Amino acid sequence: MDEYQSGLESLFARRQEMSHKDSGNPDVIISEQRHVMITQLSFFTSETAKMTKFLSSLGLSALPSYSQFKSGKNIAVARVEMEKIWLIGQLKSTAKAYKFYPLDLSSARNIIRLSGTRADDVMARLCAVDFRDNTRNFFATSIHHVGVHVHKQKDAYEIYIPRSFGETIAEYILDISSQYH
């Protein structure tokens, strides 16, 4: 099988060259998360108990609330809609997942990781979401008029971008983050 090729590779290589002039820890660190498996599962409200049981078989404690992201040992789950979740990580078998209408989104998304001391400032410029809200950690929003999902972590953000807009959004993020170097 061919090695995964990213359309963002040259952008991030250029960014890395620019950051070599910085000494110490840069204010904004941008990287691409690669080889991440994303499987979307859909279920009806009446199937919530079945979904919860399925997730527990994967080692996940519960079905997260809307706009929540929970991590297990080898897999994570994000509640993207009331009746849709994303499993992020390698599924050992999709046999049990078939009843939840699995859809492989792995090659449909670029994932950009944004961290550093000024990452909060960059995100504030990118989208109109108050990321200080501690009750949610997974947001559906838009950047540059493109629908994206953002996973807010303790010290970083992961931005899930439709692949067809990956390069445009990455350029936009690089432009904004360059103000903080």
Question: What is each stretch, according to the model?
Answer:
Residues 1-181:
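Basic, glycine/lysine-rich polyanion-binding surfaces/domains
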